[in-house]
Regions:
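Short, well-ordered beta-strand elements within core beta-sheets of diverse protein domains
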Residues: 15-21, 112, 219-221, 251-256, ...
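Structural signal for hydrophobic packing residues in well-ordered secondary-structure cores
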Residues: 17, 21, 36-39, 43, ...
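Residues at or immediately preceding the N-termini of alpha-helices
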Residues: 3-6, 25, 43, 227, ...
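Residue-level signal for inorganic ion chemistry
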Residues: 28, 73, 134, 165, ...
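Conserved C-terminal structural/oligomerization subdomain of aldehyde/semialdehyde dehydrogenase
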Residues: 220, 271, 317-459
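Rossmann-like NAD(P) dinucleotide-binding subdomain of oxidoreductase/dehydrogenase enzymes
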Residues: 93-229
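N-terminal Rossmann-like NAD(P)+-binding subdomain of aldehyde/semialdehyde dehydrogenases
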Residues: 1-101
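ALDH superfamily catalytic-core signature
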Residues: 160, 193-327, 390, 458
Length: 459
């Protein structure tokens, strides 16, 4: 799409939004139903596209992508009528004879920029929230997942006219053109580097943004943890989608006394979940492209590998890999791994862990495996992070009743469920004043006794 075509598209969407067509709750629900039905009817195509782009199995495609989108749409279909109501609030005595309320109002024309690692879910979940809130949307999927982008284009073109929801495909040139336009809200999921560019561009128009970024999410395992269960759940969260998950445990921070036991259990769980030859497993995905394949291999120190380490360039697969005796100065600890490599570091005290984590950029997630409730409370209270789990990994993002988002360097804003509706909503504060009485004390010239009345009301 050319720069002029993008300009025209944004203009058409703004005109459509200003017509009021997206405001009725009935229109929002109809849009969500169309989207739900289209996804259901195209499920086989979605599965094939995700298999081609990322090697995802059918089960994983539904569990982590299609099913999560359908669940989010279902949640919005159920709750949007309630969310969209005016919210009555208390009126202070100084505003005598008034009715005060907050009016949920859509921002207008929104831009949703999604990544390649969960290209279906991370496009359509925020879109469902935006539509429920009454916005129009321009959707820009990643160029790195072309098969899924093509399916998204077909599904959304089938459901919506472009003045309501439109898909812009392409790469950096299209991204640049889009970010020059004046949107009313921008929702971006991706890397920190690109997130900064999005925020700089948004600042030109003072456009509010949600940035869902990433970071090095720690997974703490203390000496009281159920090591066998911890290993099972860590392996699941770490190697899901070949480690290409923004909330995957980036590294394991293990108490020195249980490290060897944890490594043995992790090795067992990798064999149990992915088999003796994971490079040939139909359930194990692949790295998105050769550039990322080479980047991940460059982080592996062969001398520190205690499991895995093998790869197949022809299929872009890297074995689930575990590294021991890792320090914070190793290459694997200098950037977000975003791949199937698990470094294991050791600690001697929880205070040491908290100091170290807080000395680093705020991660998107934090996980702690422990039987000590005080330790869990201390870690989750004292460390800065977006969200997380106690005695599990990654599942916190699958709960519509909780918002999901980053903190500090891992992003800003959140979505899912009511939080997602609120993200795409501006709450107008309105006072509806009665006309049959008008207290004179606020008007000049001020008279003796007016200040006493003001002091009575305002204290």
């Amino acid at each position: 799409m050319t720069e002029q075509e993008i300009k025209d598209l944004v203009t058409r969407q703004r005109s459509y939004f200003q017509s009021g067509a997206t405001l009725p709750v009935s229109a929002r629900l109809a849009a969500l139903r169309r989207l739900y039905n289209a996804i259901s009817s195209h499920e086989k195509e979605i599965r094939r596209a995700l298999q081609k782009d990322l090697g995802k199995s059918g089960f994983e495609s539904y569990m982590c992508e299609t099913g999560m989108v359908l669940e989010e749409i279902s949640y919005m279909l159920k709750h949007t009528p309630k969310f969209a109501r005016e919210q009555r609030v208390h009126t202070p005595l100084a505003q005598f004879c008034s009715r005060s309320y907050k009016k949920p109002s859509p921002y207008g024309v929104t831009l949703i920029m999604s990544p390649w690692n969960y290209p279906f879910m991370l496009t359509l979940s925020p879109l469902a929230d935006a539509l429920a809130a009454g916005n129009t949307a321009v959707v820009k999927p990643s160029a790195y997942s072309p098969y899924t982008s093509e399916v998204l284009l077909r599904i959304l073109a089938e459901c919506f006219e472009p003045q309501y929801v439109a898909v812009v495909t392409g790469g950096r040139a299209e991204n640049t053109c889009l970010l020059r336009e004046h949107f009313d809200y921008i929702f971006f999921t991706g890397s920190q580097a690109v997130g900064k560019e999005v925020m700089r561009s948004a600042a030109e128009h003072l456009t509010p943004v949600t940035l869902e970024l990433g970071g090095k999410s720690p997974c703490i395992v203390d000496q009281t943890a159920d090591i066998r269960l911890a290993a099972r759940r860590i392996v699941f969260g770490k190697y899901l989608n070949c480690g290409q998950t923004c909330v995957a445990p980036d590294y394991v921070y293990c108490h020195r006394s249980v490290k060897d036991q944890l490594i043995k259990e992790v090795q067992k769980q990798i064999r149990r979940q992915y088999g003796k030859q994971p490079l040939h497993s139909s359930d194990y995905g692949k790295i998105i492209n050769e550039k990322h394949f080479d980047r991940i291999l460059g982080l592996i120190d062969e001398k520190k590998v205690v499991h895995g380490g093998g790869s197949d360039r022809s299929t872009l697969r890297i074995e689930p890999t575990v590294m021991d005796n890792v320090t914070f100065s190793d290459a694997v600890m200098q950037e977000e791994i975003f791949g199937p490599v698990m470094p294991i570091l050791v600690f001697d005290s929880l205070d040491e862990v908290i100091r170290r984590i807080n000395s680093m950029p705020h991660p998107l997630a934090l996980y702690i495996f422990t039987s000590d409730k005080k330790a869990a409370r201390k870690a989750t209270a004292r460390c800065g992070f977006g969200g997380g789990c106690i005695n599990d990994t990654i599942i916190h993002l699958a709960t519509s009743e909780m918002g999901f988002g980053g903190f500090g360097e891992s992003g800003m804003g959140a979505y899912h469920g009511k939080t997602g509706f609120d993200t795409f909503t501006h709450y107008k504060s309105i006072v509806d004043k009665k006309t049959w009485i008008d207290l004179p004390m606020r008007y000049q010239p001020y008279r003796k006794g007016d200040e006493k009345l003001v002091r009575f009301f305002l204290k």
